[in-house]
Amino acid sequence: MRSSHVNKKKEDIRMNDRIAVKGLVISNDEIFRGYFTIKDGTIIEVGESSPGCEVIDMGDQYITPGFIDLHIHGIHTYLIDNGPDDLSAICRILPQYGVTGFLPTVAPRPKGEDALFLARLAEMKTAGTEILGFHLEGPFLRITGALGAGAISGADVERVHKLIEAAKPFSAIFSVSPDVEGIENLIPLMAANNTPVFMTHTAASVKETQKAIELGVRHATHFYDVFPCPSVLEPGVRPCGAVEAILADETVSVDFILDGVHVDPVAVKMALINKQNGTGKVCLVTDANVGAGLDPGEFTFGNMGDISFAYKGAPARSVKDNTLAGSGLTMDQALRNAVNWLDIDLPHALKLVSLHPAQVLGIDHHKGLLSAGYDADFVVLNNDLGVMQTWINGKCIYNKDKQINRK
């Protein structure tokens, strides 16, 4: 049972109670003034007429599906790579940014240590934002980026098996580079049981990328970031590589760090056009690091040493060499950036942080929408799209005003 920031016993919601939530409901492409009814942590009815039970009235505030972050390393002063205690703290903090589910993203460690560390994280009992699997950013990468030398490893079938086992009962979701030698022997193992496999940190050719997709890779994380062009082969001819192969394939989804630095908004607009008709969609992630959500300052990030933020929401950079090292973005700010920068309406922007990530994970039959049969994971936003409340499995986990208007 997850804890609630609503402390008064008379305001606790027992899971067996039927209760309705009223406000400006947003689900899929619709905004309507209405209700949805919750029982046992599940939405059982959605409509515009009163359901005849106790109602929590959100007034003129928006009620949206909960946000899902597919790529996050840390927040505030906490870093997943510091261990279970920091992971537990992150789960408690994320609801204030509207995040109801996430993939804790683990940086690579030396062989042997990585599986032991992952097993410690997986057995941790947490309260707050729901863990939906573990995202392993490495070690099967071609380009290190800010992850250090541990991100580089040759194909190792035994290592993959051990990491998959260590993550249980969760899924181990690997980010790999299609241009790692022998990766074709690993992708089918990683993709077993319909587990998504991501690609990133790559300068792969079109053929290498297409082969990875054929073997089961269906998503590209922090797209464009650490996706350099292959070497120019013909003077005057723009080289094509992983970016173009991914954009051309309607089955592959992508995610972006929409902070205004990692990627130009025009590139996100281009992906929205390319991905509008296929099964592959566009998502937003934070790739957040220690310091995200806090005022500018310097923080310590594992092997990178000290990192700094020039302004709130900015990318993290190594103090030593100015290398990009994740971001200071939060999911609510990513949503606001999408509305302000991408020329899309609020329902469309919400899909980038809720339904589309759920589709990537294959859980869109019960997460990502406010619809009958779905988990009661939702966020209450004010007119400025600031997070006022976050509910997970039908319970209020974060409440900025510490009050609930019951009728």
Give the ranges of each region predicted by the language model.
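Active-site gating loops and adjacent loop-to-helix segments of metal-dependent hydrolytic enzymes
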Residues: 92-103, 143-168, 211-253, 295-324, ...
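Active-site core of metal-dependent hydrolases
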Residues: 165-295
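Divalent metal-dependent hydrolysis catalytic cores, especially in the metallo-beta-lactamase
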Residues: 73-76, 88-117, 129-143, 168-179, ...
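His/Asp/Glu-enriched, well-ordered alpha-helical/loop segment
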Residues: 238-256, 273-286, 292-374, 378-380
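C-terminal cap of metal-dependent C-N hydrolases
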Residues: 23, 359, 369-407
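Divalent metal-coordination and catalytic microenvironments
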Residues: 23, 41, 60, 71, ...
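Histidine-rich, glycine-flanked metal-binding segment
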Residues: 3, 12-19, 24-64, 403
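Alpha-helical scaffold segments that flank or form the walls of functional sites
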Residues: 61-62, 70, 80-130, 151-166, ...
